[in-house]
């Protein structure tokens, strides 16, 4: 059975980089998928679905639920690795509920933990506006992305706390410290 770890955090929290490094350090057993990367890859294909994704992401809005869930489940099931890290998901209560429903309806994948990389809004803003990855990284869109992240956060945290799978990690430290803590935590489930 595949072990799933969801890594959430504000834009600029470092969740994608953390997950990439952990997967690289454990490439035999761990696969990493960034929801953002999966959606950007689809968008770049300029397919009908890709253009729809681009319409939402260029405004800092959430991509429709069914597109996101399809993309994620397809990535998990096609992976040859036993431990799957997905960052940037869930970003809404609806995404959380849809994934929970899908996970409960099958026995190939088990959710082991939801890890939140916690940073202040100031840290997130400095990182995102200093990074300028694309057209969506300007101040107006940053604030929209923060609102989209923060609005459902308490409900998402409580849902996973009630399932005893929520873990918070301080994202205000060096990348080495964050990655070491997260990696040790993830690997503790493999034993």
UniProtKB/Swiss-Prot annotation:
Subcellular localization(s) per the UniProt record:
Cytoplasm
Q: In which pathway does it act?
A: Purine metabolism; AMP biosynthesis via salvage pathway; AMP from ADP: step 1/1
Binding-site residues, AMP: 35, 40, 61-63, 88-91, 95, 133, 145
* Protein's UniProt keywords contain Ligase: no
Which of UniProt's keywords are assigned here? ATP-binding, Cytoplasm, Kinase, Nucleotide biosynthesis, Nucleotide-binding, Transferase
Task: Report if keyword Cytoplasm is assigned.
Answer: yes
Report residues binding ATP. Answer: 12-17, 131, 173
Give, as one word, the top-level EC class.
transferase
A GO molecular function annotation here is: adenylate kinase activity
Cellular component (GO) terms are:
cytoplasm
Query: One Pfam match, by short name?
Result: ADK
Q: Which PANTHER family match?
A: NUCLEOTIDE KINASE
User: What name goes with this protein?
Assistant: Adenylate kinase
Q: What is the lineage of its organism?
A: Bacteria, Pseudomonadati, Campylobacterota, Epsilonproteobacteria, Campylobacterales
């Amino acid at each position: 059975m595949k072990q799933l770890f969801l890594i959430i955090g504000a834009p600029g929290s470092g969740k994608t980089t953390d997950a990439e490094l952990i997967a690289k350090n454990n490439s035999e057993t761990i696969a990493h998928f960034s929801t953002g990367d999966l959606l950007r890859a689809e968008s770049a294909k300029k397919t009908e679905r890709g253009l729809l994704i681009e319409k939402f992401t260029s405004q800092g809005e959430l991509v429709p639920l069914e597109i996101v869930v399809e993309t994620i489940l397809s990535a998990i099931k096609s992976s040859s690795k036993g431990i799957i890290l997905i960052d940037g998901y869930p970003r809404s209560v609806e995404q959380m509920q849809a994934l929970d429903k899908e996970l409960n309806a099958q026995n190939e994948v088990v959710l082991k933990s939801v890890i939140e990389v916690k940073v202040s809004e100031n840290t997130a803003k400095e990182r995102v506006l200093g990074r300028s990855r694309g057209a969506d990284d300007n101040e107006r869109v940053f604030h929209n992305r923060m609102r989209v992240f923060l609005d459902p956060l308490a409900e998402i945290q409580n849902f996973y706390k009630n399932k005893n799978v929520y873990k918070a990690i301080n994202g205000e430290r060096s990348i080495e410290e964050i990655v070491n803590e997260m990696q040790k935590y993830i690997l503790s489930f493999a034993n």
